[in-house]
From Swiss-Prot:
Coiled-coil parts of chain: 342-380, 658-690
A GO term for molecular function: ATP hydrolysis activity
UniProt-recorded name of the protein: Kinesin-like protein KIF9
Keyword Phosphoprotein: yes
Localization per Swiss-Prot or TrEMBL: Cytoplasm, Cytoskeleton; Cell projection, Cilium, Flagellum; Cytoplasm, Cytoskeleton, Flagellum axoneme
Record-stated family: Belongs to the TRAFAC class myosin-kinesin ATPase superfamily. Kinesin family.
Cellular component aspect of the GO annotation: cytoplasm; kinesin complex; microtubule; podosome; sperm flagellum; vesicle
Length: 790
C-alpha cells in the first residue's frame, strides 16, 4: 500500500417497527442516504429552512446481520493487520443506536457476537494458517470515563495495583498509555477471557434511550508481532488493531438526564465535540495544527486518526422520525470523517540480537572468501584478525627503523596493518617529543614567555634583561666573561640580605613552582615561546661563578666565615602562616598579589556595572508596563467612541500614536540593555575565573615558599644556596623534608613495613593517617583564608 486513502465510513440503521420511510431513503447502490423533512408551517410563508440532505458513504447497512457487518467493515482491516498495517474500527452514534451491539454483540448468543470477538477469532485462525511465522498476540483494554483513564483488566490477580495514575505519553514510536497493563495471549480462549473480564468492569447505567447504556469510551487494542520461522532475517513486523466503542451523544434538553447521568452526559458530549473538531481539522488540508490534546479521547487516538493505519467508521443511527435531528448530526460526522485521509504503511522493526548473529555469519563467510583469495594469490601468511601485542611491537620496531633511516620501506599487507602503522607513527613521535622535553628539563629551567610574572621575577633577580637576553651573555667568541647590558639593574643589598635565598632560590621557586612546565601554562615545549635559563652547572655560567668566587677570596673579609654573616639566623620555630603570608605578599609574591588585586578590582567594577544595568532594565520594564496600560486605555476609549472611516479603517489620534512610538522605542532600548547585561554577565564569569585562578596560584606559591623557607632542614639549605650541589625548586619538597626526618618519622616508616604481618590492622591505621592528614589540611586552609580576609 503506502499511498494515501480516505477513511471508510459506513452507516448502520437500527431496526425498528416505526421506520420513517417518507423521510429516510437509500440509494440504489446502497452507498447513499437521503433525508427529507417537511417544512414547518408555523414558520410562516417565508421559510428558508433546509429540508433535503444527501450523504455519500461507503455503504449503508440496513437490516444487516452481524456476519454481514463484519465481512463488510472489519475483515480486511484485521487481515491486513497481520501483514504489518495498523487498523482502527470505531463505532459512533447517539445513545441507544446500537454501537455496543455492533462492536461487542450479544454475549448470550454466539451468532450475535460483534466485531470485537470476531476480530479475535480471525486473528488466531490466520495465525494457524501461517506456520512459517511466529506471531505474538497481546491485548489491552482502556476505559475513558469522565476524562479519567482506567484499566479494565487491572482486576486480574497477577496485575499489581497501579501506584501512579495512568497518563498518555508520546515518543518517536507513537502514543502509548503509561500504566496500562498489556497481557500476552497464546490461545483464543485466553483472549476471550480477557475481553469478558474487561466487559464486566465497564461502567453502564440505565438511560431513557437504553437500559444498559455505556457511560464511557472503551478502546480494546490487539498488539501483533510477527517473526519469520524459516528466514533468519532480523526484520520483523508489528501492528495493532484499535477497536473503539464510543459512548453515545445525546441532547440534554430532550433526554431529560439528571444527577450523575447528566454529569456523565456532559463529559461525553464534550469529548465527542473535541473529536469532531479534530476530524474537521484533519479533513482540512490547509490546517497546520490538529487539536489532539484537547481531551483524553483524541489524544489516545492520535495514531489512529489520520495516521498510518486503515481506519473504518461505523455510524449507528435511528430510523425513527423522532430521532431525525440526532440522525442528521451523526451523518454529518460520518461525511466529515470521509474527508480524512490516511497513509497506511507496514511497521517494520529489526531484532538487534538476530542482526548481530547474521552479521557474525556474514563476517565469517567474508573471511573464508578472503582466505581463498589470498591462497590463490600466494598470500597465505596474511591474517585479518585483531593484532596481538607481538605484532604491534613488530610494527613499532619497523616504524622506528624507518624514521632512523635503516629501513627503506614498510610493506603493505592489509588495511588493519596500515591503520596500525599510522597509529605507531603517532606513538613514536609522541615518545620522541617527551624525550626532547625531558632532556631540556634536565639541562634548562623552562619559563613560558607569556608568563609575565615569571619573566618579571627573573628580571628582578638580574638574570635576564628587559629584552629577554641573559645577563652576562658573551658578545664575542674570544672572551668568555661577556659584558652585561646597560639596561640591567643590580639588586639592592638590603633586600638581598633580608631574603637570604635571593637571587637563585626565589628564581627557582618562580620558575619551578610559579610556572610549572608540566601545567596548563606550558602545554608545548618550544624555543619560540620558552626562555631557556642555563643551570649553575652549565658551561660559561659555571666558569663565571667560579671566577667570582676567586675574585671575592682575594678581597679582605671582616671575619673568617663571611657566608655565615650573610645568612640570617633561622628561628627555632617557624612563624605562623598568617604572618608569613603577609610577608610573602609584600616580597616574593608581590607581583602575583598585584595581579590578583587588579583582577579583583575589575571584577568588582563589572559587578557594579551589571547591578546598575539591571536597575536600569527594571526601570525600563516598569515604564513599558505604564505605557502599555495607557495605550490600552486609549484603545478602549477609541472603541467606545467608535471612530472609524467610511472604509472601516480605524482612526488613531495623536496621543495614541505617540504612545505606540514610545512603546516601540522602550522595547528597543530594553532589548539593547538586556544584551549589554548578558555581555556583562559573561565578562563577570570570565573575571571570576581569573580571580579564582590567581587566588589558587598565590596560595600555591606561598605554600612552596613557606616549605622551602622554614620546613626544609638547615643542612639542605646550604645545598640549595647559590653554588650548592642542588638547585632549589628542582627537588620536590616532600623528598627534601624526608632527608631530615626525625625518629618519629622513621618509626612511622617502620610501622608501615611491619603492618603487612598483621593485615587486619591495615585498614585501621590507614584510616587514622588519612583523618590526621585531612585535619591538618583543613587547619592550614582555614589559617590561609583568615589571613587572606585581613
Amino acid at each position: 500500500m503506502g499511498t494515501r486513502k480516505k477513511v471508510h465510513a459506513f452507516v448502520r440503521v437500527k431496526p425498528t417497527d416505526d421506520f420513517a420511510h417518507e423521510m429516510i431513503r437509500y440509494g440504489d447502490d446502497k452507498r447513499s442516504i437521503d433525508i427529507h423533512l417537511k417544512k414547518d408551517i408555523r414558520r410562516g410563508v417565508v421559510n428558508n429552512q433546509q429540508t433535503d440532505w444527501s450523504f455519500k458513504l461507503d455503504g449503508v447497512l440496513h437490516d444487516a446481520s452481524q456476519d454481514l457487518v463484519y465481512e463488510t467493515v472489519a475483515k480486511d482491516v484485521v487481515s491486513q493487520a497481520l501483514d504489518g498495517y495498523n487498523g482502527t474500527i470505531m463505532c459512533y452514534g447517539q445513545t441507544g443506536a446500537g454501537k455496543t451491539y455492533t462492536m461487542m454483540g450479544a454475549t448470550e448468543n454466539y451468532k450475535h457476537r460483534g466485531i470485537l470477538p470476531r476480530a479475535l477469532q480471525q486473528v488466531f485462525r490466520m495465525i494457524e494458517e501461517r506456520p512459517t511465522h511466529a506471531i505474538t498476540v497481546r491485548v489491552s483494554y482502556l476505559e475513558i470515563y469522565n476524562e479519567s483513564l482506567f484499566d479494565l483488566l487491572s482486576t486480574l490477580p497477577y496485575v499489581g495495583p497501579s501506584v501512579t495514575p495512568m497518563t498518555i505519553v508520546e515518543n518517536p514510536q507513537g502514543v502509548f498509555i503509561k500504566g496500562l497493563s498489556v497481557h500476552l495471549t497464546s490461545q483464543e480462549e485466553d483472549a476471550f477471557s480477557l475481553l469478558f473480564e474487561g466487559e464486566t468492569n465497564r461502567i453502564i447505567a440505565s438511560h431513557t434511550m437504553n437500559k444498559n447504556s455505556s457511560r464511557s469510551h472503551c478502546i480494546f487494542t490487539i498488539y501483533l508481532e510477527a517473526h519469520s520461522r524459516t528466514l533468519s532475517e532480523e526484520k520483523y513486523i508489528t501492528s495493532k488493531i484499535n477497536l473503539v466503542d464510543l459512548a453515545g451523544s445525546e441532547r440534554l434538553g430532550k433526554s431529560g438526564s439528571e444527577g450523575q447521568v447528566l454529569k456523565e452526559a456532559t463529559y461525553i458530549n464534550k469529548s465527542l465535540s473535541f473529536l469532531e473538531q479534530a476530524i474537521i481539522a484533519l479533513g482540512d488540508q490547509k490546517r497546520d495544527h490538529i487539536p489532539f490534546r484537547q481531551c483524553k479521547l483524541t489524544h489516545a487516538l492520535k495514531d489512529s486518526l489520520g495516521g498510518n493505519c486503515n481506519m473504518v467508521l461505523v455510524t449507528n443511527i435511528y430510523g425513527e422520525a423522532a430521532q431525525l435531528e440526532e440522525t442528521l448530526s451523526s451523518l454529518r460526522f460520518a461525511s466529515r470523517m470521509k474527508l480524512v485521509t490516511t497513509e497506511p504503511a507496514i511497521n517494520e522493526k529489526y531484532d538487534a540480537e538476530r542482526m548481530v548473529k547474521n552479521l557474525e555469519k556474514e563476517l565469517a563467510l567474508l573471511k573464508q572468501e578472503l582466505a581463498i583469495h589470498d591462497s590463490l594469490t600466494n598470500r597465505t601468511f596474511v591474517t585479518y584478525d585483531p593484532m596481538d601485542e607481538i605484532q604491534i611491537a613488530e610494527i613499532n620496531s619497523q616504524v622506528r627503523r624507518y624514521l632512523e633511516g635503516t629501513l627503506d620501506e614498510i610493506d603493505i599487507i592489509s588495511l588493519r596493518q596500515i591503520k596500525e602503522v599510522f597509529n605507531q607513527f603517532r606513538v613514536v613521535l609522541s615518545q620522541q617529543e617527551q624525550e626532547v622535553e625531558s632532556t631540556l628539563r634536565r639541562k634548562y629551567t623552562l619559563i613560558d614567555r607569556n608568563d609575565f610574572a615569571a619573566i618579571s621575577a627573573i628580571q628582578k633577580a638580574g638574570l635576564v634583561d628587559v629584552d629577554g637576553h641573559l645577563v652576562g651573555e658573551p658578545e664575542g667568541q674570544n672572551f668568555g666573561l661577556g659584558v652585561a647590558p646597560f639596561s640591567t639593574k643590580p639588586g639592592k643589598k638590603a633586600k638581598s640580605k633580608k631574603t637570604f635565598k635571593e637571587p637563585l632560590s626565589s628564581l627557582a621557586r618562580k620558575e619551578g613552582a610559579s610556572s610549572p612546565v608540566n601545567g596548563k601554562d606550558l602545554d608545548y615545549v618550544s624555543t619560540s615561546k620558552t626562555q631557556l635559563v642555563p643551570s649553575s652547572k652549565d658551561g660559561d655560567v659555571k666558569d663565571m661563578l667560579s671566577r667570582d668566587r676567586e675574585t671575592s677570596s682575594i678581597e679582605p673579609l671582616p671575619s673568617d666565615s663571611p657566608k655565615e654573616e650573610l645568612r640570617p639566623i633561622r628561628p627555632d620555630t617557624p612563624p605562623s602562616k598568617p604572618v608569613a603570608f603577609e610577608e610573602f605578599k609584600n616580597e616574593q609574591g608581590s607581583e602575583i598579589n598585584r595581579i590578583f588585586k587588579e583582577n579583583k578590582s575589575i571584577l568588582n567594577e563589572r559587578r557594579k556595572r551589571a547591578s546598575e544595568t539591571t536597575q536600569h532594565i527594571n526601570a525600563i520594564k516598569r515604564e513599558i508596563d505604564v505605557t502599555k496600560e495607557a495605550l490600552n486605555f486609549q484603545k478602549s476609549l477609541r472603541e467606545k467612541q467608535g471612530k472609524y472611516e467610511n472604509k472601516g479603517l480605524m482612526i488613531i489620534d495623536e496621543e495614541e500614536f505617540l504612545l505606540i512610538l514610545k512603546l516601540k522605542d522602550l522595547k528597543k532600548q530594553y532589548r539593547s540593555e538586556y544584551q549589554d547585561l548578558r555581555d556583562l554577565r559573561a565578562e563577570i564569569q570570565y573575571c571570576q575565573h581569573l580571580v579564582d585562578q590567581c587566588r589558587h596560584r598565590l596560595l600555591m606559591e606561598f605554600d612552596i615558599w613557606y616549605n622551602e623557607s622554614f620546613v626544609i632542614p638547615e643542612d639542605m639549605q646550604m645545598a640549595l644556596k647559590p653554588g650548592g650541589s642542588i638547585r632549589p625548586g628542582m627537588v620536590p619538597v616532600n623528598r627534601i623534608v624526608s632527608l631530615g626526618e626525625d625518629d618519629q618519622d622513621k618509626f612511622s616508616q617502620l610501622q608501615q613495613r611491619v603492618l603487612p604481618e598483621g593485615p587486619d590492622s591495615i585498614s585501621f591505621y590507614n584510616a587514622k593517617v588519612k583523618i590526621e592528614q585531612k585535619h591538618n589540611y583543613l587547619k592550614t586552609m582555614m589559617g590561609l583564608q583568615q589571613a587572606h580576609r585581613k
